[in-house]
Amino acid sequence: HSAPGGGPEDQEACKPYKIPPFNPLSENGFFPESIGKFKGLRAKIDDPAFIDALDYEKVLLKKMKVEHEYPHCWRCKNPVIFRITYQWFFKVEDLREKMLQENKKVGWVPDTAKHAYESWIKNLKDNSISRQRYWGTPLPIWKCGDCGAVKVIGSRKELKAEAGKIPENLHLPWIDAVKITCGKCKNPMSRVPDVIDVWVDAGTASWNCLDNDPQKMKEWFPADFISEAKEQTRLWFSMLSIVSYLYLGKNSFKNVYVYGMLYDIGGQKMSKSLGNVISPYELIDKYGVDVMRSYMCQTNAGEDINFSWEECKSKVRGLTVLWNTHKLLINLSRETNIQPFSLKEAKVKKYFAVEEKYMLSRLHSVIRQVTELMGQHRMDEVIAPLEELFLELSRAYIQMVREKSLLGEEEEKEACLYTFAAVLLETMKMYNIIAPFICEAMYQNLKEEFALGEESISHHRWPKADAKKINPKVEQGMKLALEIIQAGLHAREKAKLGLRWPVKEALIVSKSSDVKEVVSQFQNIISTQLNAKEIVFAAEAKEMQYLVKPDYSKIGPAYGNLSPQIIARLTMDS
């Protein structure tokens, strides 16, 4: 059984056998008079009548329900049917190889999107471009009712030359009053009644917005960058390519960033009918625009995600740290009577300690990293290093220099505040692309406090990385030192020993020569942060005692009656 007029797969299967497609159903799914006693019945709804007829004729072998995929209306959820109609098409099947070759020049993020698009191109069919609607761009094709000649009109100017007089508004219904003379039989030609698929409009946007102006096209076409959801692989991305190849012989974009879909908390597609839509305004009203932007920016390219209020709260905490950091800079400046943005690096750099060298190295490493990521259009990877940078500024650098910035020598204070201000401002310039509202509010506060020159954070140029300030060894050493400090603070917490209480010594045990070198280099920082009078390094800690604590919940079920003996032995050995 095959129904070439009832679906694309059946139609393709019948083509080699020259079986013509047909489908007598009306637009509303009713059978016509030509079908005899079944006239007036409706497809799908009246299926039982056909089954009863087969049963009456004693030709029904079996009646049963079979589960299979079937198209349904996205709005009312009722089944829909395929129905063959006459349409206008773009002939694109012979463009496939050309499109595949041109696509190799396009930068896709992620790579999976590129592979999906290539697969789509390989299976590309001639594309239907006409629709039977009222709203839409009228199909600019005139047909002669006598000889059947067809003429495609390419512009308003051409139509006016053919028709003599045309209406100001070229949409329906006014356009249908325009007649032109057939070049073959001299009889009137009328416009075909269809409108153009809206995706054709979208596909021509890349040059329509330039008014087809040669100079603008040379300057702005093709587009450097476009971005849309992955479902646009077969829609906008496809039509952008098709119409561009047909008209200009080349692609209309150079780089594509593809993002995934946002589902509800339980992983379902959001739908008004299901009542599970999370409005962006709900999120904005609760936490602000920047939280929504930073939350969305962290999503891996091309991956679907389930919405999470907890992750939004995490972004709130991060942005709060950033906000508090700029307030701290203002307070430090007032307490020390130092204007950090008036300081020149040439004056203060000779007083840079390892903390300043580390923080400035981290800044320029991140500038270089983020600039490269932006150039490669890997937008989802930009936010993490920027957030790490301002969190390190707040939780690492400021903690390390807090005492020095208030009680140190004047030159030390200036070095601290210069570094603090420089790192904060450069970070804000970059993070502004993600969280522009908080960055602008911070900048206006800094501008008022320190009389900064630019009117807005957005008026600043993108930072440039200074390779001379990047010191990987210092960064790696400080990273390890911070891990040691974190481990020491954890040990204090386990021992329920507050940080205010000094300890005689902090013992760092490791067989790593790298750790030994870091402990030696960053000894003062480690001892200060751990409030330890002495830092001791040892490859082995002979005076340490290891205690083995049996996990009764695991031993009991696994060993049954042997559990008491095993527990006793473990306790004895430790």
Language model segments and positions:
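Feature 926 captures the class I aminoacyl-tRNA synthetase adenylation module centered on the KMSKS loop
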Residues: 119, 123-200, 204-206, 247-289, ...
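Alpha-helical support elements that line or immediately flank enzyme active sites
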Residues: 8-13, 239-248, 386
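A short glycine/serine-rich beta->alpha loop
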Residues: 220-232
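Alpha-helix C-terminal capping segments
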Residues: 15-18, 208-211, 245-248
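NTP/phosphate- and nucleic-acid-binding module
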Residues: 1-114, 118, 132, 147, ...
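Structured mid-domain segments that build the active-site/substrate or prosthetic-cofactor binding neighborhood
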Residues: 295-298
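Short, solvent-exposed helix-loop connector elements
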Residues: 108-113, 303-311
